[in-house]
Amino acid sequence: MKYYKFGETNIEIGSKYLDLYLEENNYEEDQNILINKLKENGFLLIKGLHDKQEISSIRKKIISILTKDDIFDSGKNEITGNLKEGIIKTSTVRGNEKIKIPELDILYSRNKFTSFFENLLGGEIISPEFKWLRTVGKGSSSKTHCDSVYMGRGTKKMLTCWTPIGDVSPQMGGLAICLNSHKKNEILKTYAKSDVDIDLIEGHFTDNPLEMVDKFGCKWATTHFKAGDVLIFSIFLMHASLTNTTNSLRISCDTRYQRKDDKRDNRWFGECPLMHYRFHDDNNIKEKLVDSRLRWGI
């Protein structure tokens, strides 16, 4: 039996809780088929939308920039990004704050990539200038949440695109999605309608990922992601990341896309976006998760 760590819980692959399988699609497939799959499943795993060598080059550059922090084992391959023994890198690096590399902007502006999203969304697209570039070290993970609570003031058709910067195994903290969670009305009418800057909730839905299976019947699924892959999903789809149990730094980048003529969440657009003006203010007291769940009645 094989187990992966999910938060503080070890979950058996192939159990009722977690599958090591996500349906794969090619970017050249019929767009109508992909659109219908996205609507039905809430996600698309697209193989080879980015150039593998370009992704590898970006990973090398990010690791090179972070080398000055003296966190890497210099004896390892430069693309591996192995952390020194005893160092736990748990911080999230924001692309707009610490690492600014033009290669990321070039990556996401390539015609192959933008054309795919324009076909998927049925019109000219726009993306927030802000990019969520993340480095995830040993012991780190993200909790169960959907993106609507963070960026739900604009169109409800906004899509998240998660790009692994390099190969990402489940052991490295790959993303896991909660199948069919975007169809759960009890969540859509309560938690998913929340706004972290208005309601000052904690952001995530549960501390226990197994609850999504036991209470809501939504199984988790992940896979071995390869450089060049992208995982596209609805802002209402519950997701999380497995815990990185390796010494390799997981690097990924989140970007968001919507039709240019759709309503925007202005917290995330412009050269100096407002972002989370209350949620990240330590002077504001957030509602405890247990109290939020009681208020929602779920």
Residue ranges and their predicted role:
Residues G152-P170, H224, I232, R256-R259:
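Short, conserved beta-strand element in jelly-roll/cupin
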